[in-house]
Curated annotation (Swiss-Prot), chain A:
InterPro entries: Asp/Glu-ADT_sf_sub_c, GatC. GO terms for molecular function: asparaginyl-tRNA synthase (glutamine-hydrolyzing) activity; ATP binding; glutaminyl-tRNA synthase (glutamine-hydrolyzing) activity. It catalyses: L-glutamyl-tRNA(Gln) + L-glutamine + ATP + H2O = L-glutaminyl-tRNA(Gln) + L-glutamate + ADP + phosphate + H(+); L-aspartyl-tRNA(Asn) + L-glutamine + ATP + H2O = L-asparaginyl-tRNA(Asn) + L-glutamate + ADP + phosphate + 2 H(+). GO terms for biological process: glutaminyl-tRNAGln biosynthesis via transamidation; regulation of translational fidelity; translation. This is Glutamyl-tRNA(Gln) amidotransferase subunit C.
Amino acid sequence: MPGITREEVAHLARLARLELKPEELEHFAGQLDDIIGAVARVSEVADQDVPPTSHPLPLTNVMRPDEVRPSLTPEQALSGAPAQEQQRFKVPQILGEE
Amino acid sequence: MTTTTDLVSYEDALASYDPVMGLEVHVELGTKTKMFCGCSTALGADPNTQTCPVCLGMPGALPVVNATGVESAIRIGLALNCEIAEWCRFARKNYFYPDMPKNFQTSQYDEPIAFDGYLDVQLEDGETFRVQIERAHMEEDTGKSLHVGGATGRIHGASHSLLDYNRAGIPLIEIVTKPIEGAGERAPEVARAYVRELRELIRALGVSEARMEMGQMRCDVNLSLRPHGTEKFGTRSETKNVNSLRSVERAARFEIQRHAAVLSSGGTIVQETRHFHEDTGSTTSGRVKEEAEDYRYFPEPDLVPVAPSREWVEEIRSALPELPLVRRNRLREEWGISGNDMQSILNAGALDPIVATIDAGADAASARKWWMGELARSANESGKALDELAITPVQVARVAELVTKGELNDKLARQVILGVLAGEGTPDEVVDKRGLKVVSDEGALTAAVDEAIAGNPGVADKIRGGKVAAAGALVGAVMKATRGQADAARVKELILEKLGVTEG
C-alpha cells in the first residue's frame, strides 16, 4: 500500500482550512502514513463477514418521538457569537474568501 | 450580471445531441421538530428562536433521530417502489460554509434508507414515462443567509452575511434519479412532469406540503449531452435550486441549448454548479463542483444505525394511501372524461376541490363545471389558488344542489357564488339577501309571458308561423322582466304552449 503523499496532506489541510508550513506538511505526512498503515493492517484481518463498526455500543434504532422541546432563547443562542446583527450570527463575506 | 451565453436553437441542439438528465429533489418534511433535535420547525418565527446546542453544533451536544422523520423517509421510499435498507447509517458531509454551524451536514452517503425504485410520470399527451430512482436518503436542511451590503440581498458584492439557524436541522429527504435517458426532445417536459408527479406523491403521503414557492421542495437539474449514437455520458452541469415546475422545464431546455453551443464550437463543458435566473430563464456559472471525496464523508459516530424491522416496513406499506397516478386514472374513468380534461383539472389545481365537492354530495359534472368555470376564472383574476378562494367545497356542493332542485338556474348560481366569494355569507344566505330565487310561481311567469307576447306581436307571429328559433327573443324579454330569475327552459315551454306551436 502506497502511503499518503505530501500533496495529499496539503490538499486535506486546505479542505480543513489549516495553514501548514512546509516542514509541518512533511511531519504530518509521516505521521498520517503510520496511522493509515496501522488501519490498513486491521482491514487485512476484517473480511466481508465482519460487519463494520460505527459505534462501540451494539445499538440500533435509537429514536425520539416528534415532540417539540424548548429551544434556547436567541440571547443564549447568540451568546458565543463573535459578532451579531439583527438577532443573527454575523459572518464575513462568503464568496471571494479564497 | 450581463454576460451573454451562446445558445443554439433547441431543434439544432437535439439534431446533434442526446440529452441525459439526473434530477435531485430535496423535500422538507412537515415534522413538528427537526431531524436530530426537538426544536420546532414552525415557519415564520423570529431569527434564531428555534435553535439548541444540537442544531448549533455546540461541542458535546448529542443528536437523536426523529422517529417520524425516519417513518416519512420509508413512506416516500415505498411509494417510489424502492427497497428499504435493513440497516443503514448517517454520515458526515464535511464542508466549511456558514449555513451549517457544525461544519458538516448530517446526511447519508453509501447507505441510503431507500434505493432502486421508479416513478411513472404522465406527459401532457398522456404518454407514460418511467423514471428510475437511484436512492432516497435522509439529511438536514441548512440555515438561512442574509447577504448585507450587496445589491438586493445577493451574495455578490455583499460585505458580510447574517445567519438564522431556525431552518438548520429541519429534516430533508433527498430523492435522486438514475440518469434519465431516451427522453430526447421531451427531456425538459419529462423533468417537469417528474417533479410534478413527485410533488403530488409527497402531498398524498402527507409527509410535506411540498410547496415549491416556499422552498419546501427544491430541484437540482443535472444535464449532459452526448452525440447521437454514443453511449458515454458527456460532462454534466448541475443547476441548483430550481424552484418551480416551469423553471425546471426552462432550466433543462436552456442547458441543452447552452451545452450544444459549447460542444458544437469545439469547446468542453466544465463540471460546475450553475444558478438559474427566473427572470431570464437562463443559468450562470456558480462554483466549480468539489469532488465527492472532498466532502470526506465518514459514518456519523454520534448516531447509531437505523435498522427498520421488516414488520415496521410492511406496516407502513399497508398504510400507504392510493397513489396519485392510480387515483387520477380511477377518477378519470369514474367521471368519464378525457386525459386532456384531467390534465386541465390538474393544471388548475382543481382535483382535490372537485373531489371534496363530490364527497359533499354534488354530482361530478356540476362539481367540475363550477371549479373549472366560474371559480377558476375568479381565482385567475385574483391571482389565488383555487383552494385559497373564500368558498368551501361544501358550499359549492350546496349551490349545485340548489340548481338540481330547480331553485337556481346557472345564471343565478353564478351570482350566488360571487356573493359567497365576496364574503356575503353561505349560499343560502346570499340567496336570501340578494333575493335570488328562480320564479317558479306559474302565475307570475304566465303573466310575464303574456306581457312579452303582447309587447312583441311581430315576433309572436313569426313563432306562430313556425319559426321556433324566434322564441329566444321572447324568452329574453321574460328573463329581463323577471330580472333573470326565471327558469328559461320553462319560459320557452310556456311561450310555445301559448302560441300553439310544438318544438321540432
